[in-house]
A protein has these predicted regions:
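Structural signature of the two symmetry-related core transmembrane helices
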Residues: 77-91, 170-173, 267-281, 362
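Helix-to-loop junctions at the C-terminal end of transmembrane segments
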Residues: 61-75, 160, 253-267, 349
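Intracellular juxtamembrane helix-capping segments at the cytosolic ends
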Residues: 34, 115-129, 305-318
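Helix-loop boundary and gating motifs at the non-cytosolic
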Residues: 2-58, 204-247
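Cytoplasmic helix-loop-helix junction between adjacent transmembrane helices
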Residues: 108-147
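C-terminal transmembrane helical hairpin of 12-TM major facilitator-type secondary transporters
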Residues: 267-310
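A membrane-interface helix-boundary motif in multi-pass transporters
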Residues: 161-174, 347-366
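A late C-terminal transmembrane helix in Major Facilitator Superfamily
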Residues: 322-353
Length: 389
């Protein structure tokens, strides 16, 4: 993989990418750690679900708003302050034992003050590489993000089982502060100044590529939410974690194999269609553990390439300030999409049968493919790959 090596050898790339992953590692643990801790503290899955929902809503609302503040406050000051506030709220959740409503409020604060690490990193990436390396860098970034979702839940479970759920949530708080500070101290970030956007808040949504990204991400991630809930319902809690992990494994492989190959306007449609193949496969044997595992692996092959392609398209379509806001809207779409897909699948399961979740997964997958098809004309051509690829 000579071109991936060339990207990593560029000054600052490894430093920014590595510290970004550490700063965001808490997000990989967040869902499971909060559910385990709040349920154990208050003995109620309902309260645990509300707590996680509050955090998700907070993060969805704050994404684009915080991205707009990067030019006014400066990325280092903003993300450092946000990480400190969010981590303080996490520590409150970890150690508070009073009325549950205060934990819900604290979880909302956690979401509202989640530092926009990924938006900052993706906005600064294009300044660290040559134009022909764009697809490689965003493919590498999207692929490595899967590590958060592979190891985050595992670590949350291990710490909770070995020590306590309190220790798991407290660990997230510490990792977030330390990782964010390491990220913020990078010279590429510490001295970074975002030019003020000439657009009003939400102005980037007037550009068709942003609408395309929001639609595709919302529907695609909604299919993942439904798939996760369905997998747990059909197979049970214990095997579900491993089976869902194969989707991330497929995404890791797909990211390195295909993510950098995006060039044409139709690349996004091709990669989203790969996920649809996996979603259709599951109907052949909808309750078999091995077949579901294989199906989710195929789904994963298209995940990282899809996210990498979308990130690359945003990078070549906007300047730093506007790209950060655009990534914020995409993050909001993903959060709302996952929550919506999971909720719809849960309702369908409760009122019909467990494997009915696959119909929700398939429907959302079809919506993602159609979104990619009808918005392909708005996609920019991506820079040609390096000749040694």
């Amino acid at each position: 993989m000579p071109s991936y090596s060339a990207v990593l050898s560029r000054p600052g790339v490894t430093r920014v990418m590595g510290s970004q992953l550490l700063a965001r590692f808490a997000f990989g643990m967040m869902s499971l750690a909060l559910i385990l801790h709040v349920e154990q503290t208050f003995h109620s899955y309902t309260i645990a679900g509300i707590a996680l929902g509050a955090e998700t809503i907070g993060a969805a609302v704050s994404g684009p708003l915080l991205a707009r503040q990067l030019a006014k406050v400066g990325p280092r000051r903003l993300i450092s302050w946000l990480a400190s506030t969010s981590s303080a709220a996490l520590l409150f959740v970890a150690f508070f034992r009073g009325d549950w409503i205060w934990v819900i409020i604290a979880c909302l604060v956690v979401g509202l003050t989640s530092p926009p690490i990924q938006q900052v990193a993706r906005a600064v990436y294009p300044t660290l590489i040559t134009k022909n390396q764009t697809s490689y860098l965003f493919s590498l970034d999207a692929t490595l993000q899967e590590l958060l979702w592979v190891f985050g839940p595992v670590l949350a479970t291990m710490i909770s089982a070995t020590y306590s759920t309190t220790a798991s949530v407290a660990f997230m708080a510490v990792v977030q502060v330390v990782g964010t500070e390491m990220f913020a101290r990078n010279p590429e970030i510490a001295g970074l100044k975002f030019p003020p956007s000439k657009r009003r808040l939400g102005g980037v949504l007037r550009k068709p590529i942003t609408i395309s990204a929001v639609l595709i991400n919302a529907t695609l991630v909604a299919s993942f939410g439904a798939a996760d809930v369905g997998t747990v319902a059909v197979l049970g809690m214990q095997p579900a974690g491993i089976v869902i992990g194969t989707l991330s494994l497929g995404s890791l492989i797909g990211g390195f194999a295909f993510g950098h190959r995006a060039q044409s306007k139709w690349a996004m449609l091709k990669f989203v269609s790969i996920t649809m193949v996996g979603f259709l496969m599951v109907f052949a044997n909808p309750t078999d553990l091995v077949w579901i595992t294989l199906s989710w692996f195929v789904v994963g092959l298209g995940v990282a390439p899809s996210f990498a392609t979308m990130a690359s398209m945003i990078a070549v379509s906007f300047g730093q300030a506007d790209s950060a806001e655009a990534y914020g809207w995409i993050n909001t779409a993903q959060l709302l999409g996952y929550s919506g897909g999971a909720a719809i699948a849960g309702i369908i399961i409760d009122n019909t049968f467990h494997a009915a979740a696959w119909y929700v997964t398939g429907a959302m997958g079809v919506a993602a493919v159609l979104s990619a098809l009808f918005t392909a004309k708005f996609n920019p051509e991506l820079p040609k790959r390096e000749k040694n690829a």
